[in-house]
């Protein structure tokens, strides 16, 4: 395909302003820019300072998501997202006109699936539209079946298991957990991600065919989805994109030097990396305390990411003993990909967010699963029972993990026959992840086919 035709094809990305949503979309944008397309990413003005976009082929525009004083705080997720949609639509219209005037008309808007009526919005603006999903195909199938009324979330009393098309039998504890908090209709909004997919020009999922073969096939029987993952920096996978070593976005400042220096001094496969994601996870004091002592009682070295707002939950006794035994390094943030790919890392204790799951799987790191909410329990089900690359810490009667169980699960992953089997499986999936993104791999071919259709349309 001629480079000139590619460079005249313009894709604009509209991410949802959260790190877990922006990172995979940024990776997709970088890959398309490397393949020759013109790319513009629309950033919320409030977070532009967190972005590190050095690729000259990626352009940025800013819009503000500020609410006017008269807006107040909408009473529901639907009302909130409705206001966001109105503001985004109005400002996108101006941005699209600006691009046309400058000689770079936009051919396609790739929009985070959380925005309501995304495809309708794109078509109203006279541009093709493609929702971008940041969860797995399996979770997409669960949410969609719930939208159809085939199951309820939270599940009804007495329900012990659920059977759904393409999905392994799910126990009650494998279903998504929605802690609604401010927005009691949050789950309804998640279901509404599927409201206009029949009108979409493309639908993108951050997964790959061999990872979710049956689940992707089932979703494809409903809509024309495209698997384009795993979306992590190329230097950790296929190495096609020169110097693509990070996601280019960090909402928190990481002390890279001290993390890597500490890991460099440890033996290969001897360290547990623990992190529960980029969003405040609201673990109770008792829960944090049990995790902390479980890490210490495992007798393995550990590096634990505890964001500043959660650090006060760590007891002085734990901190003193961890320092005395020189077993742990507690940091407010760290470069996760660099850490997971470090030779000293033997396992990853994770909340099972989809990005973290994909990163660990792609780097061949077995997991200790501690799912908290949203799609995480379903991801943990796949980590343990489907891909067989981790163990799940059981929850006690009070809804809190116990330190002994935490320590035992760490030992299961780090040593013995179970650990050997999990590491072997993790390395197998690492190879398949690389294969998907290599030239001619399943996701690489899917991306090339998408580009060809877009350019010729």
Curated annotation (Swiss-Prot):
Record has Transferase as a keyword: yes
Xref: InterPro entries: UDP_glucos_trans
GO molecular function, one term: UDP-glycosyltransferase activity
SUPFAM superfamilies assigned to the protein according to its UniProt record, in alphabetical order: UDP-Glycosyltransferase/glycogen phosphorylase (SSF53756)
Protein name as it appears in the record: UDP-glucosyltransferase 45
Species: Panax ginseng
GO terms for biological process, alphabetical: saponin biosynthetic process; terpene biosynthetic process; terpenoid biosynthetic process
Catalysed conversion reaction: (20S)-protopanaxadiol + UDP-alpha-D-glucose = (20S)-ginsenoside Rh2 + UDP + H(+)
Annotated residues for binding of UDP-alpha-D-glucose: 134, 336, 351, 354-356, 359, 375-376
Chain positions recorded as an anthocyanidin binding sites: 21
Function: Component of the triterpene saponins (e.g. PPD-type ginsenosides) biosynthetic pathway. Glycosyltransferase that catalyzes the biosynthesis of ginsenoside Rh2 from protopanaxadiol (PPD).
Species lineage: Eukaryota, Viridiplantae, Streptophyta, Embryophyta, Tracheophyta
Keyword Disulfide bond: no
Keywords assigned by UniProt, alphabetized: Isoprene biosynthesis, Transferase
E.C. designation(s): 2.4.1.-
Top class in the EC scheme: transferase
Matching Pfam families: UDPGT
Pathway: Secondary metabolite biosynthesis; terpenoid biosynthesis
Homology family: Belongs to the UDP-glycosyltransferase family.
Active site: 21, 112
């Amino acid at each position: 395909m001629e480079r000139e035709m590619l460079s005249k094809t313009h894709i604009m990305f509209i991410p949802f302003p959260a790190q877990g949503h922006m990172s995979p979309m940024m990776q997709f944008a970088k890959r398309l820019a490397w393949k020759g397309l013109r790319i513009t990413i629309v950033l919320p003005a409030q977070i532009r300072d967190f972005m590190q976009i050095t690729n000259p082929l990626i352009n940025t525009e800013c819009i503000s998501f500020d609410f006017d004083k008269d807006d107040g705080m909408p009473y529901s997720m639907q009302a909130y997202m409705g206001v966001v949609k109105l503001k985004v639509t109005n400002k996108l219209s101006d941005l699209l006109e600006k691009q046309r005037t400058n000689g770079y008309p936009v051919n396609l808007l790739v929009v985070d699936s959380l925005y309501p009526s995304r495809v309708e919005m794109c078509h109203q603006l006279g541009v093709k539209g493609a929702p971008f999903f940041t969860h797995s195909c399996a979770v997409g199938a669960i949410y969609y079946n719930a939208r159809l009324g085939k199951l309820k979330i939270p599940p009804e009393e007495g329900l012990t298991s659920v059977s759904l098309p393409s999905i392994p039998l799910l126990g009650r504890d494998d279903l998504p957990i929605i802690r609604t908090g401010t927005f009691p209709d949050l789950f309804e909004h998640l279901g509404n991600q599927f409201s206009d997919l029949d009108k979409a020009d493309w639908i993108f999922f951050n997964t790959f065919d061999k990872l979710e073969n049956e689940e992707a096939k089932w979703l494809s029987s409903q809509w024309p989805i495209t698997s384009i993952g795993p979306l992590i920096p190329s230097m950790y996978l296929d190495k096609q994109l020169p110097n693509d070593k990070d996601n280019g976005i960090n909402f928190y400042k990481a002390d890279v030097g001290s993390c890597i220096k500490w890991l460099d001094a440890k033996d290969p496969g001897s360290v547990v990396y623990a992190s529960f994601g980029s969003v405040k996870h609201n673990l109770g004091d008792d829960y944090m305390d049990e995790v902390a002592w479980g890490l210490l009682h495992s007798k393995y070295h550990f590096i634990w990411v505890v964001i500043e707002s959660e650090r006060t939950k760590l007891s002085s006794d734990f901190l003193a003993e961890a320092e005395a035994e020189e077993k742990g390094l507690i940091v407010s943030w760290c470069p996760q990909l660099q850490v997971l790919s470090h030779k000293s890392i033997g396992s990853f204790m994770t909340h099972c967010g989809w990005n973290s799951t994909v990163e660990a799987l792609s780097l061949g790191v077995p997991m200790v699963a501690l799912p908290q909410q949203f799609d995480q329990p379903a991801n943990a089900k796949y980590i343990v029972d489907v891909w067989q690359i981790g163990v799940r810490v059981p929850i006690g009667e009070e809804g809190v993990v116990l330190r002994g169980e935490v320590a035992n699960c760490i030992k299961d992953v780090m040593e013995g026959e179970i650990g050997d089997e999990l590491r072997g499986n993790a390395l197998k999936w690492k190879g398949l992840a690389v294969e998907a993104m290599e030239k001619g791999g399943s996701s690489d071919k899917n991306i090339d086919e998408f580009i060809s259709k877009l350019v010729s349309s």
